[in-house]
Amino acid sequence: MKIGVLALQGAFREHLNMLGTLGAEAVEVRKAEELPELSGLIIPGGESTTITKLLDIFGMAEPIKALAKKGMPIWGTCAGMICLAKELPGDISGVKPLGLMDITVRRNAFGRQVNSFEAMLKVKGLDKADFPAVFIRAPLVEKTGKGVEILSKLPDGTIVAVRENNLLAISFHPELSGDNRFHRYFVQMAKTYKA
């Protein structure tokens, strides 16, 4: 089983390191031809405009969509959540999301870099201990479709983690938390996929 981390831009090394703590085979992915050999793909945080443009430039958007439809697990964190969304309200400044998840996501919902924060979250599917979530220029989920499961919310009710079948999206950066439980959760999703 091999888990790929999209390595075109963003926090891919941190995801690779976190997967390494679990003994998972993790690889950097930069070409469309590397995708079919994967059991799962992580789209990391970074700059959503840049990531979606590079997905088009490198011919990866359509193969990722096809693999998602076949059931390959895909996990988007922060900017990766934006990439997976069907709808982005407001000024999307050239972002072309993959449109895979039935969610409406607002970019930079918590403000600029200086407004970054950490929060302890209860997360459905993880053990009872709260998860230390790091929010940096994070998006939020404004609306979910019928098939979308809400995994976590902030105390004010803001949705920050969702799952729709083989697709997982979270607003924050679990790779920066020092806690590998979300990565373990995704590895378990990847184990169920038959390429």
Curated annotation (Swiss-Prot):
It catalyses: aldehydo-D-ribose 5-phosphate + D-glyceraldehyde 3-phosphate + L-glutamine = pyridoxal 5'-phosphate + L-glutamate + phosphate + 3 H2O + H(+); L-glutamine + H2O = L-glutamate + NH4(+). GO terms for cellular component: cytosol; glutaminase complex. L-glutamine binds at G46, E47, S48, R107, I136, R137. InterPro entries: Class_I_gatase-like, PdxT/SNO, PdxT/SNO_CS. It comes from the Bacteria. Its EC number is 4.3.3.6, 3.5.1.2. Keywords: Glutamine amidotransferase, Hydrolase, Lyase, Pyridoxal phosphate. One of its GO terms (molecular function) is glutaminase activity. SUPFAM superfamilies: Class I glutamine amidotransferase-like. The active site is at C78, H173, E175. GO terms for biological process: glutamine catabolic process; pyridoxal phosphate biosynthetic process; pyridoxine metabolic process. Pathway: Cofactor biosynthesis; pyridoxal 5'-phosphate biosynthesis. The keyword Hydrolase applies. In the presence of PdxS, forms a dodecamer of heterodimers. Only shows activity in the heterodimer. Belongs to the glutaminase PdxT/SNO family. Catalyzes the hydrolysis of glutamine to glutamate and ammonia as part of the biosynthesis of pyridoxal 5'-phosphate. The resulting ammonia molecule is channeled to the active site of PdxS. This is Pyridoxal 5'-phosphate synthase subunit PdxT. The gene is pdxT.
